[in-house]
């Protein structure tokens, strides 16, 4: 028998389930595009360094340690969250630079060829429906 209607489970604190408070102390100031690009670049570089350091720590970490699996799982979770956030920030950065979205050109282009099928006859059935007969190839 289930108690309550709320599912207990992975309740990690995120900005979606934790309140965020912003206190305005000054009048709003406009920021130039160059300042935004500088901030984004430094923020992305800092977070990529964190990802690199956590992956290097898990690779070269203590394998004999009993908590190695828990540490690896935590760093994997951090890595997944950061990498998805960084990809979104890189899209914003490209948008501020006025560049088109990044595309993966490593795959071979797909060529689609179409062939025309010729109808042989269109008839009306006794119940009023349309019957189309196609030529067999």
Curated annotation (Swiss-Prot):
It comes from the Eukaryota. GO terms for molecular function: DNA-directed RNA polymerase activity. The N-terminus is blocked. Keywords: DNA-directed RNA polymerase, Nucleus, Phosphoprotein, Ribosome biogenesis, Transcription. GO terms for cellular component: nucleus; RNA polymerase I complex. Its main location: nucleus. DNA-dependent RNA polymerases catalyze the transcription of DNA into RNA using the four ribonucleoside triphosphates as substrates. Component of RNA polymerase I (Pol I) which synthesizes ribosomal RNA precursors. RPA14 seems to play a role in the stability of subunits RPO26 and RPA43. In vitro, the RPA14-RPA43 subcomplex binds single-stranded RNA. Present with 3100 molecules/cell in log phase SD medium. This is DNA-directed RNA polymerase I subunit RPA14. The gene is RPA14.
